Amino acid sequence: KKAAYYKLKTGMNPGFEQKAVIFNQPQMDIRIQPKGILEEAKWLETANFHGIEPYQQRYRRFFFKEFNLDNPSEIKKVTLFMYPESKCILNLNDTWVNQEVKPNQLNEIDLTGYARKGVNLLFASFPFVEGKKQFAARVIVEYYKYDRTEFSTDSSWLTTDYYSNPSLTRVFPQPVAPVVVDKPGYAESIAYNTFKEWRIQVPIDALENLNNIYMRINYSGDKAEIYNGYMLSDDDYNSHATWTVGLNRQEHSVEGKELTLVIYKLDKDEKIFFDLPANGTCLLYTSPS
């Protein structure tokens, strides 16, 4: 690229002399790709029966997931996103989750009131049914300090078959690794309208010989967040102005990282306070219903 500038010339004939500087414009390969709500989840087999014996009529297949919420900040919200192909019930920390899980659709289950700091144990219970059935799930934990952690179904969700619900006072078969199956053909079409996600891949040498790189983002939605791993790196409330993000101004380095961009609607009772204008008037934005 070529840029022009003017230099003051002194002497007998003072004036401004035009100069030019030539520089190479770096080619940035920062890729952004949409991310499905259950894209990273493995699909686990809940049934594969061509006939159920009479003694198995009351049997259920259980899936167990132990997880630790050890972030020092208080828990703000815990949400389970689950797509099962058959009915199931949920239990978290020895308490049955009083929310219906509907088959053949994406369920959003609020687990906030059941979760606790430290070790948690979640299990899902599926009755034996004929045919092949499967499910996928994802848990997102939000903290008041704006950190976020999540996990999805994988081979760590141990499973066992039994005729009664597990409890501390009852012996039941030792859980084993689940059967991981191929994603169904409709998996890519599973969508969630409250928020959408994208992956942002930053090259490892993106900032080499540069002071900064700016991403300029225009989006449709009420709020946007960028996560670097589990930590909130930047956010923006949509005021219909271009959101400018300086990659070298983030608290933690983003070079060589995969960032997550989240854009979502606000709750109906959410309030946004913008910067105080010059005349001292207070601006308050309430999300439309």
Regions found by a protein language model. Give the residues of each.
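A glycine-anchored, Pro-Gly-centered beta-turn/N-cap motif
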Residues: 116-118, 255-257
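Short strand-edge motifs at loop-to-beta-strand transitions and within beta-strands
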Residues: 63-65, 105-109, 243
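Mature extracytoplasmic enzyme cores
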Residues: 1-35, 60-66, 83, 125-127, ...
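Short beta-strands within extracellular/lumenal beta-sheet-rich domains
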Residues: 57-69, 192-204
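Aromatic-lined ligand-binding clefts that engage carbohydrates, nucleic acids, or primary amines
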Residues: 17, 67, 71-92, 122-125, ...
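Conserved small/polar residues in nucleotide/adenosyl-binding loops
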Residues: 285-289
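Exposed aromatic-hydrophobic patches
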Residues: 108-112, 244-251
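Short beta-strand-plus-loop segments that form exposed binding edges in beta-rich domains
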Residues: 124-130, 263-268
